Swiss-Prot record:
CDD domains: CpxP_like. This is Periplasmic chaperone Spy. It comes from Escherichia coli (strain K12). Homodimer. One of its GO terms (molecular function) is unfolded protein binding. Disruption phenotype: No observed growth phenotype. Increased levels of degP and rpoH transcription; may induce the sigma factor E regulon (rpoE). Loss of about 50% of periplasmic alkaline phosphatase activity; very sensitive to tannic acid. InterPro entries: Cpx_auxiliary_protein, LTXXQ. Induction: Induced by many sorts of periplasmic stress. Produced upon spheroplast formation, not induced by growth in 0.5 M sucrose or 0.35 M NaCl, nor by mutants that have a leaky periplasmic space (at protein level). Induction is partially dependent on the Cpx envelope stress response encoded by cpxA-cpxR; does not depend on sigma factor E (rpoE). Induction is also partially dependent on the Bae envelope stress response encoded by baeS-baeR; cpx and baeS effects are independent.
Length: 161
């Protein structure tokens, strides 16, 4: 039973670490004439579209946002090859080394923090190119998103019992 539990924990950590590595992975920019993918919802990605909804951005502001986003994409790096190999070595070993796994996870968490910090900095740069009226609308949109509960996609409504 202990081996089964250890295997389950190791698998869970490995899949979680793989998801973190996948989430940190960046993609190359699409050609300018390419249509956005359905889940990307617009020119600026899935969340940027909502951030700037109803703000009536000027062409100059849109260009500035594109430049800021391009700069952020250049900063976002995929985990180094040696980190991905180290993660694979932990997963593929005959025995699970918890200390080694925790050290690898800590290293990945540092990278995730750096990515989140860069993301917040980018959003601040974009916010600061808005006019005062656009900032007011942006803040109203933000408050609206906080108070409204999003509809769950693909889930059936709960039945009353």
């Amino acid at each position: 039973m202990r081996k089964l539990t250890a295997l389950f924990v190791a698998s869970t950590l490995a899949l979680g670490a793989a998801n973190l590595a996948h989430a940190a992975d960046t993609t190359t920019a699409a050609p300018a004439d390419a249509k956005p993918m359905m889940h990307h919802k617009g020119k600026f990605g899935p969340h940027q579209d909502m951030m700037f909804k109803d703000l009536n951005l000027t062409d100059a502001q849109k260009q500035q946002i594109r430049e800021i986003m391009k700069g952020q994409r250049d900063q976002m790096k995929r985990p180094p090859l040696e980190e991905r190999r180290a993660m694979h070595d932990i997963i593929a070993s005959d025995t699970f080394d918890k200390v080694k796994a925790e050290a690898q996870i800590a290293k990945m968490e540092e990278q995730r923090k750096a990515n989140m910090l860069a993301h917040m900095e980018t959003q601040n740069k974009i916010y600061n190119i808005l006019t005062p009226e656009q900032k007011k609308q942006f803040n109203a949109n933000f408050e609206k998103r906080l108070t409204e509960r999003p509809a769950a996609k693909g889930k059936m409504p709960a039945t009353a019992e």
